């Protein structure tokens, strides 16, 4: 078992023939990901990267049984692409696009929830189940197969955490980059819950940042559900000034509970093994697993 994606997943790329879609689809295919085709309206019937191109997601679902989609489209079109995927019956939608208008994203989010699909992102690096499926923009070589699940708001810190876990002789079950926008489809708590229910995941690394309540909500849920698996946590943005975004649109300290200090306090109170530097993640994981 893994979560969200594996070697059986049938993946399509929305924005397949564009420069971003082409570049990352090439990397995904080279990794061994089961990319079954892509969607670019007006180019249906062509082939690209030796895969079929479809005009619509519905055609892709009908003809190649696609069940997972990754979206590489400009912000103005991405929310519609999410809703098109859901309407066509896609179960897991991974949205890389940054800067989708909040109003568009609110509609798409409500649509996804109403239909029971799973949305990862937007503004995320994607999801990787090592040695099975890389559905995103992450460097695949950093990830080795194992029993540690990673959930992170940050792309680069996902790669850093994986590199450290692997350097300890351990590996990753699945890594989920949930995204750094204010409105995202899968929260920290949602992702942690997936790992808690995954028999192959024995430890969870939870990486958050200033702004919002996602990490506190996840920590309280972990405690309420009985701390079934060890969780190692890190919060980025310790030195961020109040009222300034730090890299991500959602990374902004509004109230006193949004600070790194407050989040880390809540996480510790809930039994999470919190580290103060990303450089300590790997060693802490090895420690709690021993």
Regions found by a protein language model. Name each.
Residues 1-290:
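Catalytic-core regions of core metabolic enzymes
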């Amino acid at each position: 078992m893994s979560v969200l994606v594996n070697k059986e997943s049938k993946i399509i790329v929305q924005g397949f023939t564009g420069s971003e879609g082409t570049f990352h689809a090439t990397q995904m295919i080279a990794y061994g990901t089961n990319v079954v085709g892509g969607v670019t309206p007006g180019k249906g019937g062509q082939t690209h990267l030796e895969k079929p191109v479809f005009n619509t997601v519905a055609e892709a679902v009908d003809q190649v049984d696609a069940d997972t989609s990754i979206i590489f489209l400009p912000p103005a079109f991405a929310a519609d692409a999410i809703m098109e995927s859901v309407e066509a019956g896609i179960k897991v939608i991974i949205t890389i696009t940054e800067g989708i208008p909040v109003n568009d994203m609110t509609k798409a989010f409500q649509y996804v929830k109403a239909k029971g699909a799973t949305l990862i992102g937007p503004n995320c690096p994607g999801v990787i189940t090592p040695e099975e499926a890389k559905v995103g923009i992450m460097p695949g070589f950093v990830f080795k197969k194992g029993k540690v699940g990673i959930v992170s708001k940050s792309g680069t810190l996902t790669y850093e955490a994986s590199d450290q876990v692997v350097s300890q002789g351990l590996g990753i079950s699945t890594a989920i980059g949930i995204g750094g926008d204010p409105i995202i489809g899968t929260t920290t708590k949602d992702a942690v819950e997936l790992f808690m229910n995954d028999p192959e995941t024995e430890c969870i690394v939870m990486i958050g940042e200033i702004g919002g309540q996602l990490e506190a909500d996840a920590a309280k849920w972990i405690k309420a559900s009985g701390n079934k698996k060890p969780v190692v946590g890190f919060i980025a943005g310790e030195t961020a000034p109040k009222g300034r975004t730090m890299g991500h649109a959602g990374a902004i300290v509004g109230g006193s509970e949004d600070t790194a200090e407050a989040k880390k306090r809540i996480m510790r109170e809930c039994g999470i093994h919190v580290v103060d530097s990303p450089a300590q993640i790997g060693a802490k994981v090895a420690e709690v697993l021993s």
